[in-house]
């Protein structure tokens, strides 16, 4: 049997877990001396409450190889194949943990760790498509080839409402964050080839949201795509972004999701983004 596993730095729509048989191994969220399993011991709202209360951004850590081994044994039976699809290895050690765990359980399961080169709902979309291909009769090799082909063509573009959370998490320097706040500058970040880079800075939120659409539009033009809006505690902006994006793309499906805690911890509330996922 084919099992599909992703980590908590990815997102799926609530119904996908049961509909497509996707299992999620939690990320560890560290507040001070306490550790919480994302989605098990702390949800998104609980996370933001703690951030508001303590004015500190928690640290996040990938599942350990031991946690992976325990998780694989929990969700699979001897002889199963496990596609283990994870957040870009350039931003996290999760993929490395999965590789180590795969070696440990190689006599029990055929684990295939995959670096998605993506995050958030990009990982979820890969997992969903993998299950669809399996149900269509495709082999494991064909499914892996599909993932390896599409993962570098999907694009994620984000705008941060503030650099304060990135500063607290150590992603940007204090001076940069202070200057951006004073000038009301909104940074634009693009996830490309597994790397997340700040590519532009604009002066208003409205201009930033426009660029989140314009940047991938320049690349995809009229190609058929899936659109996925992302937001961190700002569903209104996420919905507005998605509705505007629909006017500019040849989309076949559109959806919206909260940003995973593991991602939101580094980017902060008010972050809004768009994933453009190619269909050909």
Task: Describe the residue ranges of each PLM region.
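Residues at secondary-structure transition points
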Residues: 38, 42, 63-66, 117, ...
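Short, contiguous strand/loop micro-motifs
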Residues: 1, 58-59, 85, 117, ...
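Acidic/glycine-enriched edge-of-secondary-structure segments
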Residues: 48-64, 192-206
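Glycine-rich phosphate- or other oxyanion-binding loops that anchor nucleotides, phosphorylated ligands
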Residues: 53-56, 62-89, 96, 100, ...
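Mixed-charge interfacial surface used for oligomerization/domain docking
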Residues: 3, 9-23, 28-30, 90-104, ...
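N-terminal glycine-rich anion-binding loop in soluble enzyme alpha/beta folds
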Residues: 3-62
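Short loop/turn motifs at secondary-structure junctions
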Residues: 1, 78-81, 250
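A short glycine/small-residue-enriched secondary-structure motif
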Residues: 44-48, 77, 99-104
């Amino acid at each position: 049997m084919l099992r599909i596993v992703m980590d908590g730095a990815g997102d799926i729509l609530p119904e996908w877990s049961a509909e497509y048989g996707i299992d999620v191994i939690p990320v560890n969220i560290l507040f001070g001396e306490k550790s919480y399993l994302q989605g098990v011991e702390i949800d998104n709202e609980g996370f933001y409450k703690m951030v508001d209360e303590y004015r500190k951004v928690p640290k996040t850590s990938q599942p350990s190889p031991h946690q992976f081994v325990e998780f694989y044994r929990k969700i699979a039976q001897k002889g199963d194949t496990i596609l283990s699809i994870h957040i870009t290895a350039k931003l996290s050690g999760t993929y490395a943990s999965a590789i180590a765990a795969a070696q440990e359980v190689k006599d029990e399961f055929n684990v295939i760790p995959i670096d998605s080169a993506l995050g958030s709902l990009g990982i979820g979309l890969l997992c969903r498509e993998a299950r669809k291909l399996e149900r269509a009769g495709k082999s494991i090799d064909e499914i892996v080839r599909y993932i390896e082909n599409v993962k570098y063509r999907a694009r994620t573009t984000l705008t941060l409402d503030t650099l304060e959370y990135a500063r607290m998490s150590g992603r940007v320097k204090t001076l940069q964050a202070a200057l951006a706040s004073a000038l009301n500058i909104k940074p634009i970040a693009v996830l490309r080839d597994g790397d997340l880079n700040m590519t532009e800075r604009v002066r208003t939120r409205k201009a930033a949201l426009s660029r989140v659409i314009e940047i991938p539009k320049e690349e995809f033009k009229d190609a058929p795509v899936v659109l996925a809006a992302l937001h961190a505690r700002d569903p209104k902006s996420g919905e507005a972004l998605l509705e505007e994006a629909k006017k500019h793309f040849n989309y076949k499906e559109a959806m919206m999701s909260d940003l995973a805690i593991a991602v939101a911890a580094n980017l902060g509330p008010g972050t809004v983004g768009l994933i453009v996922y190619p269909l050909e």
